[in-house]
């Protein structure tokens, strides 16, 4: 195949300029005043913006923004499963969790890596307990989560976004799924960690919880690093409390989505 010598091909691997960020990496996680690098307290969550109906072609969609963490989700289905799959009385959830190539410090590949596959499986595990899958025999619901910018806690943001997208799609659910994450540094827990906090060498471990607040059910639990038993139990309880604080925002976003849908139907009818 002839080579176009006039074309300048882009590099396969790129890295942004992070000189200011490198200085922040050398700072301690907690200042003398008891504040984190972004000015939050240990148990303080980042401000959250959540909105549904951002992808017109999808059955349901949502967008979440937690300062510099930005995630979008699109839901398609229920649709008939492939003939190769065995008949099941319950429907099936599938998820593709993907970091956009430009979302992280290092350029991500177009193919799913091991981390993205692990996150995809965890999202399915977290949402299966909330969706009434018995209502959709021999059908599947496809969830596509894309991280547009990753400044930490992208997995929890993806679960929250997917939960709202399922609700907007009209999928019957037992409850909305909220999610929260924290990192542990000795006896100190930092809720909703940023990317810099998550990669700090001072961190002992990380816990991510998916929680159904109304039913009081933990639908997903993911732990990395080394934590003592007492620390792990305390971390899970703290994440559950964080999920409960996020839940009203999730509920209000779904209410606003329903209002917009009803208003649109009334305008079409008139």
Summary of predicted features, one role per range:
Residues 1-270:
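Polyanion-binding surfaces on beta-sheet-dominated domains and ring/shell assemblies
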């Amino acid at each position: 195949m002839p080579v176009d010598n006039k074309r300048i091909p882009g590099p396969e691997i790129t890295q942004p300029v992070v000189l200011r960020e490198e200085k922040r990496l050398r700072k301690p996680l907690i200042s003398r005043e008891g504040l984190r690098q972004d000015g939050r307290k240990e148990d303080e969550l980042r401000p959250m913006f959540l909105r549904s109906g951002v992808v017109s072609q999808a059955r349901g969609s949502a967008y979440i923004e937690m300062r510099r963490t930005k995630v979008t989700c699109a839901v398609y289905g229920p649709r008939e499963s492939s003939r190769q799959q065995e008949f099941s009385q319950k429907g099936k959830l599938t998820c593709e969790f993907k970091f956009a190539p430009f979302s992280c410090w290092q350029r991500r590949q177009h193919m799913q890596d091991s981390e993205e596959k692990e996150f995809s499986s965890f999202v399915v595990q977290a949402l299966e307990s909330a969706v009434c899958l018995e209502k959709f025999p021999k059908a599947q619901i496809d969830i596509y989560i894309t991280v547009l910018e990753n400044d930490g806690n992208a997995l929890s943001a993806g679960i929250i976004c997917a939960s709202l997208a399922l609700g907007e799609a009209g999928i019957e659910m037992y409850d909305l799924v909220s999610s929260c994450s924290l990192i542990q540094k000795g006896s100190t827990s930092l809720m909703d960690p940023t990317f810099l906090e998550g990669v700090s060498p001072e961190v002992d471990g990380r816990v991510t919880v998916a929680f159904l607040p109304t039913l009081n059910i933990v639908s997903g639990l993911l732990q990395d690093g080394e934590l003592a038993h007492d620390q792990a139990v305390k971390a899970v309880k703290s994440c559950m409390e964080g999920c409960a604080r996020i839940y009203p925002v999730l509920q209000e976003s779904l209410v606003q989505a329903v209002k917009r849908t009803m208003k649109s139907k009334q305008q079409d009818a008139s």
